[in-house]
Amino acid sequence: MSRKQLALFEPVLLVQALTDAVKKLSPRAQWRNPVMFVVWAGSVLTTLLTLAMVTGQITGSALFTGVISLWLWFTVLFANFAEALAEGRSKAQANSLKGVKKTAFARRLRAPRHDAQADNVPAAELRKGDIVLVKAGDIIPCDGEVIEGGASVDESAITGESAPVIRESGGDFASVTGGTRILSDWLVIACSVNPGETFLDRMIAMVEGAQRRKTPNEIALTILLIALTIVFLLATATLWPFSAWGGNAVSVTVLVALLVCLIPTTIGGLLSAIGVAGMSRMLGANVIATSGRAVEAAGDVDVLLLDKTGTITLGNRQASDFIPARGVDERTLADAAQLASLADETPEGRSIVILAKQRFNLRERDVQSLHATFVPFTAQSRMSGINIDNRMIRKGSVDAIRRHVESNGGHFPADVEQNVENVARLGATPLVVVEGARVLGVIALKDIVKGGIKERFAQLRKMGIKTVMITGDNRLTAAAIAAEAGVDDFLAEATPEAKLALIRQYQAEGRLVAMTGDGTNDAPALAQADVAVAMNSGTQAAKEAGNMVDLDSNPTKLIEVVHIGKQMLMTRGSLTTFSIANDVAKYFAIIPAAFAATYPQLNALNVMGLHSPNSAILSAVIFNALIIIFLIPLALKGVSYKPLSASAMLRRNLWIYGLGGLVVPFIGIKVIDVLLTLLGLA
């Protein structure tokens, strides 16, 4: 991927984020974050108290109250800045996509063929169902499906990948995206969306959407933070009469400072930024998530359904051998296999044609001159072939051909059954060829398991994630490849219905399921899965059914998607732990300072040896504001992620962020107190 990655603190983004942070000071914007709204209210109150003291309306230290008020405003501004910076990074990514949209003219065809008469119309006038012709050098004017032709397409504006890709009719690579450029040849495209509904439009709207919906975990955490805020608010409110009864009432300024330092402002100020940054990191991996809910669900996934081809294996299955049935000549089998594959544009189909040509000099026949009827492969029939003259030739999976033979009154030979088993045991895929009700033999298709994939599955297993391989191969082939790849389970001879049933079965057990897909037949399963990553090269139906789209069309990306989701959840949990642990140190700083005059015995709690009550309170407030700024890089980049079990991750994070949350404030508050004393501000 060659798309330029944004630096964490781009100067342009910083300036815009500072501006947006000030704009977010309005009460309407603050009300969306209850914790920070309390800080905002405290800032307003202390500002009013400062003005009242300056004008002599009430007594008190205007300087001390003013400085407290200033740092409370900084606390709100820093939280706003964190959110604005995260949003700014997403909007910058959206702006780079806007540059792809160009006003152009399109050749709208009057009939669905490349030599039909064409009208030049503005691309904005194209509607769903319109047929357009694009040639080398043209920008594709709409999202659609290729219905004729084949061409090299530059998709770098969308995917960031500089290498061109092939888009052609009749396969899994028929989907094209508006805004990409044709480099060679021509395509006839059927537009699949109306203006404003293109994939590019949806990408832009998603990443720059102003009203980001909170995810379930965010809502649950927000409720916890509100509950803690209410508890501390009530506790702080009782301290004034308590201290007044002791003969020396604590000032409102000190009580506000105490409240702000005790409530979980750190995570409260960074919560939105973490969510926005999670979606931004997903986009950085070239994956478009339709919502933060999808990213969060990726972090909770515990079952991965992985297509064998392209994910676990290299995906370039090639015909390697013809194994004829008893009494059948190998050349006869090769000839029938080649005829059945003439209209098969898949890599496997082309390899069968080539192998027959190489082995027996069987030249590829002209499809048009045969006057034959081609039978395409479907997920239901699981076979394809040709009807020519009085011959009915089919090739397909073992079970599909067996049903076909038996339905035509034939018998499936035992020797072919044995050949199928032998091929499958070697990890190859057997395809059976039949003419009428007579089985001619087996074609062996070989694929290679990706290097390092077994180790990745072992890491996922450590994390408690179950891996399930999905394949159309028979059970023996599937078992051999599953054992070699190291997956936990497999689904052989998979149909769309079987995939859907498997997902529902796992969900009924309370598990969250993730899968990838690219075809229209994957759409029901994608719609059912909790995390559904559709390939950008896939069909429009698949992209609409999924809740994420992988711009690189790399099925292995599903593992990275889960990692990003888990990193976002870990970041949120780690900073929550750090924020709550912070309160302990601030308690030791402010409580003795606030009540030292009323209850001198509380000086025993001044374990940090802070210079004076005022410096202690001011140091805690300053630290409370600055820690948000220091944690912004962590919130945006995410905590360090390692593939560990849930219990191991919990122990690790408690040590780092729990203990760190206790120790860092003691050090930070003491350092600030020393600096204030040296500067004569204590």
Swiss-Prot record:
Chain sites annotated for binding ATP: D344, E348, F377, T378, A379, Q380, S381, R382, M383, S384, K395
Which is one GO molecular function term here?
P-type potassium transmembrane transporter activity
Query: What catalytic reaction does the record list?
Result: K(+)(out) + ATP + H2O = K(+)(in) + ADP + phosphate + H(+)
Q: What is its EC number?
A: 7.2.2.6
Which keywords accompany this UniProt record? ATP-binding, Cell inner membrane, Cell membrane, Ion transport, Magnesium, Membrane, Metal-binding, Nucleotide-binding, Phosphoprotein, Potassium, Potassium transport, Translocase, Transmembrane, Transmembrane helix, Transport
Q: Where is the catalytic site?
A: D307
Q: What's its membrane topology?
A: Multi-pass membrane protein
Q: By its UniProt entry, which InterPro entries does this protein fall under?
A: ATPase_P-typ_cyto_dom_N, ATPase_P-typ_P_site, ATPase_P-typ_TM_dom_sf, ATPase_P-typ_transduc_dom_A_sf, HAD-like_sf, HAD_sf, P-type_ATPase_bsu_IA, P_typ_ATPase
Give GO cellular component annotations, separated by semicolons. plasma membrane
Annotated PANTHER family: POTASSIUM-TRANSPORTING ATPASE ATP-BINDING SUBUNIT
Give the multimer and partner information: The system is composed of three essential subunits: KdpA, KdpB and KdpC.
Identification of the protein by name: Potassium-transporting ATPase ATP-binding subunit
